[in-house]
Amino acid sequence: MKVSLCSLILIAGSITAVRAETSEGDGIFAQFVTNKGTIEVVLEYEKAPKTVANFITLAEGTRNRIDPNTGRLTRAPLYNGQTFYSVVNEFGFFPLPSTFYALTGSGTSSSVGGPGYAVPDEFDASLRHNGYNVSMSALANFTGTLFGPEINRGPNTNGSQIMFTGNTILTRFDDVNSIFGSVTDPASRAVVDAIIFGGAGTTTISNVTIERVGQAALDFDEHAQNLPYVGPPLGELRVEENAVHFDHDEPLGSGSFFSFRRSSDLLSWSPTTRRHIDPDFGTEPSTQLDEIAAPKAFFDMLLTRHPGGLSPATLANRTLVLNTAPPNVITYTFVFDSTGTGGTTNYSVDASDGVITSLSYVAEGYGASLQITSSNIPTPLRARLGFDSEDASNLIGRHFLEGFNDPFWSPIGSGQLTLSK
């Protein structure tokens, strides 16, 4: 029996337009229409193609996402109706720079939400936060820090939230947030300033349109950038005497998450089971849904694919090394046992080895979240791990590390990581 899980999907027509040549030259432009005026953003589709493609498909509603308000699949344009829920307008005193930015695009007009998937970071040496930039900054699903809500959860956590910066240089966001556009014309910059100085919750986006000028812009295909997929799985339900399986048309590979729940009456549902495909174990052509074939059962299934994702399903028998960059240079080495929830710790500030006393690890699209306590480290730690590449022995990437100082989490540092295979 060939099945495709049916979900309510609102299909939005494309609002891409082609405009005549202008003095601004060729390019792809996003027009944000707000109650304070219109902002034109020049999109950096050649330097950040994946980030631009993700933004365009969310703005136009041409790709599936999860509505964070309902938990259902939708193709409704995400940014329509969104408010700038957080703004910062702090004037600096030498040598500290002023900080001007505004956040929007969570899908909830708050600090939680997102599209239901992650997109890897894209950085280019020529794209710096030197004023009036637009960048993708992942939502803070963690609790707030000592310094307020987090702007970015860490490496490879981009989703839908975007940050507009004002007339300021914010180097601390360079190679942290993925810049994908800039605001160049004076009228649009004035609108950005009005949003930032108007305060949180005072500006709403009514709609976003995408315009293209020139052949290169017309040729850019946002659907050919190997973006994540979220939606119904395709395959065949196979019922045996003592089990129920779902045979996938395309075997699940690294970076895939298959979630399902079961009901006998469509009223009460079992807890959701989430299967993550570990890169070390190849592909999964079939997923077992139930151990015993009941007389009647309904299954609600959702598939999320993150192409090229390297996150392992478990830390069992692996070694994780976190190095923090100056000025707070520390090396943490975690040697995990066969359970993946225990092991030993070496902490460069304290030469003695410690024992892991608690651990929580959640694999995500292009990284993972880790929370850990150890007998020789003075505070609980939590880290966002981003996996960028691999060699024969290790996964290689970046991390953002925090320590818990009751009642807040505060940054310790960021830097490079390796995780043994």
PLM regions and their residue ranges:
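N-terminal glycine/threonine-rich, aromatic-flanked beta-hairpin/loop signature
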Residues: 323-367
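Bacterial N-terminal signal peptides
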Residues: 4-14
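Cyclophilin-like peptidyl-prolyl cis-trans isomerases
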Residues: 18-255, 265-267, 278-286, 292-295, ...
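Tryptophan-anchored aromatic micro-motifs
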Residues: 307-330, 397-402
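Glycine-centered tight beta-turn/hairpin loop motif at sheet-sheet or coil-to-beta transitions
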Residues: 32-38, 325-329, 350-356, 376-380, ...
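Short beta-strand elements bearing conserved aromatic residues within extracellular beta-rich modules
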Residues: 258-260, 299
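Beta-sheet ligand-binding and adhesion/scaffold domains
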Residues: 373-421
